């Protein structure tokens, strides 16, 4: 909706590609992307994350069509086929495109690594450009170090295992 469009315009550098796609185009791109990544890594992918975590209605519908086991946005990880939420809460992430984004990333991550530590699942997203900025790399190290005091590192596929065991999952309303 309107909030996603505002995010795409002001919070990204044009990465909201899946925001305006219809179902068929989103489906085509998801299949092509999955094939490419699986060919590169030699293993199946666990799920799909839209650029900038922005999905339009067509992309949300295509997720279940394509058969991705999970998807994520800024606030949750869910199973597209059922709507079951596998993890809820904001993702800790950094932005390296400008001094202002670097500064806001440092402030948010410092607060989030402590404030979110009580959640059952805390997600951390690192982009390739983030590791080229020394202050962000230090922040990433501190964040992961702090979270490893109370959490075990895992993969998205682990959330699917937990779902099958009925752990963490609540139905998306």
Predicted regions and their residues:
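A short acidic, often aromatic-flanked loop/helix-cap motif at beta-alpha or helix-coil junctions
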Residues: 78-80, 92-99, 161-164
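C-terminal domain-boundary segment and adjacent tail
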Residues: 70-71, 121, 126-173
């Amino acid at each position: 909706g309107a909030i996603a469009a505002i995010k795409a315009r002001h919070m990204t550098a044009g990465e909201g590609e899946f925001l305006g796609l219809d179902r068929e185009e989103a489906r085509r791109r998801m299949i092509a992307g999955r094939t490419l990544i699986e060919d590169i890594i030699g293993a199946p992918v666990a799920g799909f994350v839209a650029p900038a975590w922005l999905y339009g209605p067509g992309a949300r519908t295509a997720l279940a069509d394509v058969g991705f086991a999970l998807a994520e946005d800024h606030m949750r990880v869910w199973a597209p086929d059922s709507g079951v939420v596998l993890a809820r809460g904001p993702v800790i992430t950094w932005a390296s495109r400008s001094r202002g984004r670097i500064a806001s990333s440092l402030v948010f991550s410092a607060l989030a690594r402590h404030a979110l530590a009580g959640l059952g699942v805390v997600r951390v997203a690192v982009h390739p450009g983030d590791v080229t900025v020394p202050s962000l790399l230090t922040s990433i190290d501190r964040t992961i170090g702090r979270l490893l005091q109370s959490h075990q590192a895992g993969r998205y596929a682990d959330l699917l295992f937990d779902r099958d065991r009925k752990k963490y999952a609540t139905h998306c309303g």
